[in-house]
Amino acid sequence: MDKETNDNEYRRQSEHRTSAPKRKKKKKIRKLPIILLIVVILLIALVVYIVHSYNSGVEYAKKHAKDVKVHQFNGPVKNDGKISILVLGADKAQGGQSRTDSIMVVQYDFINKKMKMMSVMRDIYADIPGYGKHKINSAYALGGPELLRKTLDKNLGINPEYYAVVDFTGFEKMIDELMPEGVPINVEKDMSKNIGVSLKKGNHRLNGKELLGYARFRHDPEGDFGRVRRQQQVMQTLKKEMVNFRTVVKLPKVAGILRGYVNTNIPDSGIFQTGLSFGIRGEKDVKSLTVPIKNSYEDVNTNTDGSALQINKNTNKQAIKDFLDED
């Protein structure tokens, strides 16, 4: 009898041990649909937020900006995990003729999450296809972004995939929307001449208009080289400031606003993908290069364009290739 009792007790304990994991497994299985439902709801909410924010930005741009017509641009699609963009700061000269205040080429590597930026001096004396030799920024006035792309390719071996012409007002709006408290900048000297604002030396938080003025200032011994250096400083600072939740959540609205102030052939998907990857996962430091590089140019006086930079093309082409190919 004692043996039979012991056997029954053993079976009950054995059944309890085997049934307990089954009950836990069933509970996990029952929870799985709930978890999936929560994930789906969150994804839907995220999509709705992005679409709503983007449309809000577009509506703002429609009310305050002018319609823009996309230019022809035949940059090669390379499918190498990188995106390259010709970024032009645009202003209106007297008489309404467009001109480029700054010429940059930005490359973002989706695989290594690295961004590189080249600043091209606008006074480079270059061969402009169909027009002869002129300062390189003349190419934009003569034939828009496409002629400038051809000029960069011919003279420097730079052939970007996309272009973006940034209206100065759009830059100001973007800064004020993303960072309403201002962008921290160490202003190296008092600045006011021909920039539309008055800046005092020292550490300040600059709004969109002030930051634009800081980046455009050129009336010091450094001239355009100093301005390019400050533009690169601004880009570095913006990258560091963007890596926070409050800024990232505003990106969809800012993308919508920029549609009214940036003339570009980059599709919306490309803007979102690059912006989010760069803002969230990209390295904080943006590598930069100024073209022409040191000891590769000389100041010359030309009959048609006045003072210009005569560059060693081969030296600069190799420096650019090394810079872009470096991991």
Curated annotation (Swiss-Prot):
Membrane topology: Single-pass type II membrane protein
Chain segments annotated as transmembrane: 32-52
Extracellular side: 53-327
Signal peptide: none
Compartments, as annotated in UniProt: Cell membrane
Keywords: Cell membrane, Membrane, Signal-anchor, Transcription, Transcription regulation, Transmembrane, Transmembrane helix
Stretches the record annotates as Disordered: 1-24
Pfam families given in the database record: LytR_cpsA_psr (PF03816)
Functional summary from the UniProt entry: Involved in SarA attenuation. Affects resistance to oxacillin and teicoplanin, as well as the synthesis of virulence factors.
Family: Belongs to the LytR/CpsA/Psr (LCP) family.
Listed name of the protein: Regulatory protein MsrR
Organism encoding this protein: Staphylococcus aureus (strain N315)
